[in-house]
Design a protein with these regions (language model features):
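Membrane-proximal N-terminal amphipathic helix
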Residues: 41-68
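Alpha-helical hydrophobic helix detector
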Residues: 17-33
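Short, low-complexity interaction segments enriched in Ser/Thr/Pro/Gly
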Residues: 2-3, 30, 77
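N-terminal leader/signal peptides at the extreme start of proteins
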Residues: 1-11
Length: 127
């Protein structure tokens, strides 16, 4: 039977290695989840920007058609410029956002955060 010195406290090597292995496993599980959350947040932000572009379009179209005394095609053109323009700059939708309208799709993209979202959208028809 061996006597231990008084005040000699500490962890054994096996205990330290066990803790490091457990931390490694937790990190291996948590890090991918974190990146998935970042991608999901970026896509949700892109979804909100695309929806905002469509809302701007609809508001401008309604305002021009109902209150501006313009024809339907003039109101459509004004709404396109308001919501999409030729190449919207970052100040209109926040930092680094690009909103495009092609065919029947509105796409919001932000390369800095990696978010992209596309919404199907059809313009009102003019008679």
């Amino acid at each position: 039977m061996q006597k231990t010195k008084k005040g000699q406290l500490g962890f054994t090597l096996i205990e330290i290695i066990s803790v490091l292995v457990i931390l490694g496993i937790l990190a291996a599980v948590a890090v991918p989840k974190y990146y998935d959350l970042q991608k999901e947040a970026a896509d949700k932000a892109a979804s909100a920007v695309a929806a905002e572009a469509i809302a701007r379009y609809n508001m401008k179209f309604s305002k021009e058609l109902l209150g501006g005394g313009k024809t339907c095609s003039d109101a459509l053109n004004a709404a396109k410029i308001e919501a999409f323009g030729n190449d919207r700059d970052a100040a209109d939708y926040g930092t680094d956002w690009k909103v495009t309208y092609e065919g029947s799709k509105v796409t919001a993209t932000n390369e800095a955060i990696g978010g992209t979202y596309t919404i199907d959208f059809e313009e009102p028809l003019c008679d």
